[in-house]
């Protein structure tokens, strides 16, 4: 039986998967697509063996998961696709209502930290499907992630727009890790060689993609409303590895999340036993 591997259906994950198509490695796995929250649930319920998941969900369920060492979706500052869009300046959102996209997990906590720690703002939160018009019919501001957020990054209209990657950097000076690649702990223990093989095909895919970003951008621009040049800039604004400063940024995020009651403690980052070729 092929291992079941999750795939976030956002452009920010395309560089990690594009090379799999070029290498025919997709023949060796069963790829299951979904939003971050959908994949979180599938992995935690044992219906996936390996998947990108929201970094906050790894912390909440670390007892049953281990991490691939070299894969994340992260940023050093601006991320472009995790946005707060508001009718009011961010400093004026105390007591206002904010709609949180229900496709998000890490970003919901990140926004709460930015508002409470960075701006001393305490709004009311509601959760909503990621439809901006409907969100703002019931709220004063909205949190969007992924490709729909990227569209509003390009076409900002009349909103106050805040990039949460940039806001995190301004508040902490640290890197931000939004998603990690997690492996079901039982699968990693019983299928260690297969786990290593899947790690290697993803590593090869990532290496290919980083050398062929213009090709990937041209490919994505065929069906997305973005120019190839914009997509190249977008991909370059993201980080996909998991070096030490990103691990430190993630652990700091966990500490702040614990401070506001979103975590019960700060877990260690426990990795699959794979000798990575990428330095940390």
What do the predicted segments below correspond to?
Residues 127-219:
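Pocket-lining segment of extracytoplasmic ligand-binding domains
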Residues 1-22, 81-135, 140, 147, ...:
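Bilobed "Venus flytrap"/periplasmic-binding protein-like clamshell domains
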Residues 4, 28-30, 66, 122-124, ...:
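Conserved beta-strand segments of alpha/beta enzyme cores
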Residues 43-44, 135-136, 257:
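Hydrophobic residues within well-ordered alpha-helices
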């Amino acid at each position: 039986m092929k291992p079941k591997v999750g795939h976030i259906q956002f452009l920010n994950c395309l560089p990690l998967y594009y090379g799999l198509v070029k290498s025919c490695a997709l023949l060796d796995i069963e790829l299951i697509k979904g939003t971050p929250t959908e994949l979180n649930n599938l992995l935690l319920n044992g219906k996936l063996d390996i998947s990108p998941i929201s970094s906050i969900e790894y912390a909440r369920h670390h007892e049953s998961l281990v991490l691939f060492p070299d894969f994340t979706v992260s940023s050093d500052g601006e991320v472009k696709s995790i946005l707060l869009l508001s009718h009011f300046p961010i400093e004026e959102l105390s007591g206002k209502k904010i709609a949180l996209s229900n496709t998000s997990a890490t970003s919901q906590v990140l926004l709460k930290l930015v508002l409470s720690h960075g701006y001393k703002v305490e709004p009311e939160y509601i959760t909503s499907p990621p439809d901006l018009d409907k969100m703002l019919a019931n709220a004063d501001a909205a949190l969007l992630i992924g490709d729909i957020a990227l569209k509003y990054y390009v076409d900002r209209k009349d909103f106050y727009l805040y990039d949460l990657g940039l806001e995190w950097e301004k508040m902490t000076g640290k890197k931000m890790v939004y998603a990690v690649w997690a492996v079901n702990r039982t699968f990693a223990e019983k299928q260690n060689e297969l786990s290593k093989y899947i790690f290697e095909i993803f590593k090869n895919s990532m290496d290919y993609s980083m050398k062929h970003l213009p090709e990937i951008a041209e490919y994505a621009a065929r069906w997305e409303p973005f120019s190839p040049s914009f997509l190249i800039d977008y991909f370059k604004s993201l980080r996909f590895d998991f070096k030490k400063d990103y691990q430190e940024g993630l652990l700091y995020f966990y500490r702040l999340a614990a401070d506001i009651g979103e975590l019960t403690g700060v877990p260690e980052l426990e990795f699959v036993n794979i000798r990575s070729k990428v330095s940390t």
